[in-house]
Each structure stands twice: as C-alpha cells, then as structure tokens.
C-alpha cells in the first residue's frame, strides 16, 4: 500500500524555501480522519511549535465531518505531532535559529495512518519569489517545446 496525499500546502512552497523535510504522525479523532478522507483539510496558515518537549501543529484547519453529530471535532485546534525525541530536539534547534521556521507541507495516508510532512523552511524575499516564477515558466516552455518536437 503506497502513500496517498490528501492535502498539500501550496502556499508554503511559494512563501518559503524548503531546506529539509520530515514525516511525522499526528494525533487525530475519528471525525477528523473521516473529514480528511473527504479532503476536508487546509494547511494554509499552519505552523509547528515545540513546547515542553512535544511538537504541536497549530492553525491547521480540518473541516467538521458533514455526517458528524454533536461529538464532532473543533475545526482549528492544537494537534500533537508524533516524533522521536531526537527529531524534536533537532526541530527545536532549527526553530531557534534566526530566519527558520517549521511548517507543514502536506497530509498523507501511509499504510492506513495519517501522517504530516513537515519542512524546515527559510522565508523567501520578493525577488526570490519572482526568480522562482521565472524559472518555473522557463521549465514549462522547455517541456512544451520538447513535447512539440516529438510530434
């Protein structure tokens, strides 16, 4: 059984330069899992913080399960990330460096469990964003030219 991506944080790739990625488990309730299976998540403003030796995902939004009842989950709540101690210490050291932050990049299913891909990122300046857009357009034009040449 492979990896199936549920929700991607496209905003993170635009605003940040991803230096390193890490996969983490996440503590969720039953209705949150069902909502994610229905692609009801958003990672737009989410970030990761470390407190008391535990990693937490903040400001992530998982839509309420539409068939849920009164026991439905809160949409924006603190969610605990499941990482080894050495990974948490490594992230804490990265967060303490100036200019670096840890943001979630995607939710995905792996062997039936929901995982979060988190990335250690550095913010892009406006000229860096323009440069990456120009680079992306060049690659797109090159791919289109290659496709036409094979016809």
From Swiss-Prot:
CDD domains: SmpB. It is found in: Cytoplasm. Pfam families: SmpB (PF01668). PROSITE patterns: SSRP (PS01317). Keywords: Cytoplasm, RNA-binding. The keyword RNA-binding applies. InterPro entries: SmpB, SsrA-bd_prot, SsrA-bd_prot_CS. SUPFAM superfamilies: Small protein B (SmpB) (SSF74982). Gene3D superfamilies: 2.40.280.10. GO terms for cellular component: cytosol. GO terms for biological process: trans-translation. GO terms for molecular function: RNA binding. HAMAP family: SmpB. Required for rescue of stalled ribosomes mediated by trans-translation. Binds to transfer-messenger RNA (tmRNA), required for stable association of tmRNA with ribosomes. tmRNA and SmpB together mimic tRNA shape, replacing the anticodon stem-loop with SmpB. tmRNA is encoded by the ssrA gene; the 2 termini fold to resemble tRNA(Ala) and it encodes a 'tag peptide', a short internal open reading frame. During trans-translation Ala-aminoacylated tmRNA acts like a tRNA, entering the A-site of stalled ribosomes, displacing the stalled mRNA. Belongs to the SmpB family. This is SsrA-binding protein. It comes from Chlamydia trachomatis serovar A (strain ATCC VR-571B / DSM 19440 / HAR-13). The gene is smpB.
